[in-house]
Amino acid sequence: MDSSGTVRNQTSDDHSRPADAAGTAATLYGAPAETRSPRRSRFTVRDVAAAKSRGERWSMLTAYDFTTATVFDEAEIPVLLVGDSAANVVYGYDTTVPVTVDELIPLVRAVVRGAPHAMVVADLPFGSYQAGPEQALATATRFLKEGGAQAVKLEGGARVAPAVAALVGAGIPVIGHLGLTPQSIHALGGYRVQGRDEAGEVLLADALAIEAAGAFAVVLEVVPADLAARVTKELHIATVGIGAGADCDAQVLVWQDMAGLSGGHVPRFVKRYADLRTVLGDAVRTYRDEVRGGQYPTVEHSY
């Protein structure tokens, strides 16, 4: 990682993009940091593995539409997750349980069109893979064929390892998800920290099972920081933290939370990097008032 925070790839001998002719180190996307080219290549599972081996951290954000996907891609966010959190922030459901494959695939298509450089990961929603490997493969195939996703994510530990193995065997990259798994919120009894005390050993065993099944990364959500650090050290694949401390290989947030657009309760692990809810609200109210008062449109905005 350079002084500006840019994650840099390995040399061509260790499965990464080479430096340019002048010897300038390449960025995560393969272009020199000083002269980034608009023709960046798409981030891949090999880049994730290379970052893990070099101890380089990377970021992930959710995305659900074309416009925000273009912004995140231009900002060089390497991985975009079309999460089942769309159930909450797009469709207005109370939990992630109701959202369907048919509701998510159009969102995946939009994000893929808006992000030609990021890896786009699609969440497998509740009820679309729990029946077993055959159902999981059918669902994941739809997300790749119809949505254009490059990888999928699914929740669960050892119990879903056969499904993970089936997907990987079919050539579909997989991210696991452990800890607080929102699709199981009713079984967990609410949104609370997972993996304390002896439950931490179970979580570690689940992480190892997901790795053995062939996943290239695993999300750790709302688990103690020391446990996440231990899992990260034990695994050869990347860990992606969300409320799991600072030692994970990567971090992910719901973009509306990160940018201050979400209303209501905000989890402790969220850092708001902007206050878009206030900015957008002010802009909308100003527009409303100017239309009412005849101040908009003016000659400047007329033909």
Curated annotation (Swiss-Prot):
Q: Which cofactor does it need?
A: Mg(2+)
Q: Where in the cell is it found?
A: Cytoplasm
The pathway is: Cofactor biosynthesis; (R)-pantothenate biosynthesis; (R)-pantoate from 3-methyl-2-oxobutanoate: step 1/2
Task: Provide a GO CC annotation, any one.
Answer: cytoplasm
User: Which residues of this protein are catalytic?
Assistant: 221
- Biased composition of type Polar residues is found at 1-10
The answer on whether this UniProt entry bears the keyword Secreted reads no
Q: How is the cofactor bound?
A: Binds 1 Mg(2+) ion per subunit.
Report the catalytic activity: 3-methyl-2-oxobutanoate + (6R)-5,10-methylene-5,6,7,8-tetrahydrofolate + H2O = 2-dehydropantoate + (6S)-5,6,7,8-tetrahydrofolate
In its UniProt record, a GO molecular function of this protein is:
magnesium ion binding
Keywords (A to Z) from UniProt? Cytoplasm, Magnesium, Metal-binding, Pantothenate biosynthesis, Transferase
**Major location (coarse):** cytoplasm
> Which residues make up the binding site for 3-methyl-2-oxobutanoate?
84-85, 123, 153
Q: What does the record give as EC number? A: 2.1.2.11
Q: To which protein family does this belong?
A: Belongs to the PanB family.
Subunit structure comment from the entry: Homodecamer; pentamer of dimers.
State the protein's purpose: Catalyzes the reversible reaction in which hydroxymethyl group from 5,10-methylenetetrahydrofolate is transferred onto alpha-ketoisovalerate to form ketopantoate.
Q: What is this protein called?
A: 3-methyl-2-oxobutanoate hydroxymethyltransferase
